[in-house]
């Protein structure tokens, strides 16, 4: 299959591109480089041993998207593109709604014009909001607490409405929305990984930059939660397991018309301090940290129930916490080397 990956040089998309190519598919990457760098496509090519097609473009450019879909004879789309920082979304809601919601509408308009009706959407556990029970399954109420989560939920609602329509000559939409939890780690090559610009928003990149000496210490937001060690618990999933989940969803699409939602997570939560200790073991470096006050809106625990993905996609996570941390550390060391060359 020919697969268009929007946001194709981003963190999760770049790892998915490798999994898809190695499974025999052909990927086309489409990105405006707001959250990534053009050289990621070159690193993907280095891992694969052959070049990949990478196109610069904005999701709101419907005409260009249509041309890309048609000229590359795209069979299915995996939609990763979008702004993604929770805190930033509260400060810049107009930019988030424009890039994320308008961008998705533009994509679906282009897909309709090009008669491409298979879509995997990159959603988020942020749509659930504060957990009302654990583990969180797909039937959990969706009450997002920030503009980013509301973006994702609105897009899902839009996709569900579109999935109830028919395309040209009665074609049926086949759409899967993957709600994933906290992706971490990197490809085993050390050539690609999570590469945040500025201060990292996510725990592991922050810890990695403390370990490498780029940041002095980690701030742990609260140690008085009702958890085993008092720090927040989250479901961390290796990015390569997540990438394989997208491949499984792609294979699920042809036999399943309509709109389907699935969680992708490990089903196990780790606390902030457990992650710090695991990273210390993986890196051999001591991680300096300071406990500070809780952040407004933070929750004690959040982890997934992914039984639906196991039953319908025949997918489950394979990689351990140690592998998550070891690969993230290898990538951080590689980043330091690449930036000095």
Give the positions of each predicted feature:
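Short, flexible, glycine-rich and Lys/Arg-enriched loop motifs at helix boundaries
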Residues: 38, 181-202, 212-234
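C-terminal substrate-binding subdomain of Rossmann-fold SDR/epimerase-dehydratase oxidoreductases
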Residues: 206-341
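Short-chain dehydrogenase/reductase
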Residues: 97, 145-153, 193, 197-201, ...
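Conserved alpha-helical elements of sugar-nucleotide-dependent glycosyltransferases
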Residues: 12, 203, 271
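N-terminal Rossmann-like NAD(P)+-binding domain of SDR-like oxidoreductases, especially those catalyzing
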Residues: 1-186
